[in-house]
Amino acid sequence: RMNIIINQLQKNFGPKVAVDIENYSIQSGDMLGLVGNNGAGKTTLFRLMLDLLKADGGSVHIGNIDVSRSEEWKNITGAFIDEGFLIDYLTPEEYFYFVGKMYGLTKEEVDKRVARFERFMNGEVIGQKKLIRNYSAGNKQKIGIISAMLHQPQVLVLDEPFNFLAVSYTHLTLPTIC
């Protein structure tokens, strides 16, 4: 079971408390959505969960792995926080192959897995012969979500997955990530 356990997690930026979570657990199979104002600490929490930011105190465990003390959790976790995760001088195909290679996938396996997202991409991502930097924000969002799911992770962390997506795609996003 791939539970996420948060214990005594704290992060401050100067006098501002960004995250202060005593104890929280997300059970395997659960889906959690965070809602809050801008600056409430949602993205900070995700960055702490992914060890992209050092906590002032406490810990995050994915499975039995403390994310700040081991890299093992990375093989079972997929994430897309923002377009900073993308390598924008690659085409989507090159980027998917790059991500796939990190997880030991062949080009054929990547192609097969990307094909499952065909409806979600709506003919706007693959085969366009352009760099990621030249895509719309919505299509960059799709590329990020697909890349996070490419290796079929047990844990998926997406920050604002509906951001930049046209309303007509939001109904496709949830089934894509579930």
Q: Where in this protein do the model-derived segments appear?
A:
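The feature captures the beta-strand-to-loop junction immediately N-terminal to the Walker
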Residues: 35-37
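A short, flexible loop at the N-terminus of ABC-type nucleotide-binding domains that lies
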Residues: 2-28, 56
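A short, proline-enriched helix->beta-strand linker immediately N-terminal to the Walker B motif
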Residues: 150-154
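Conserved ABC ATPase "signature" region
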Residues: 97, 101, 109-127
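Helix-to-loop junction immediately C-terminal to a conserved catalytic motif
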Residues: 50
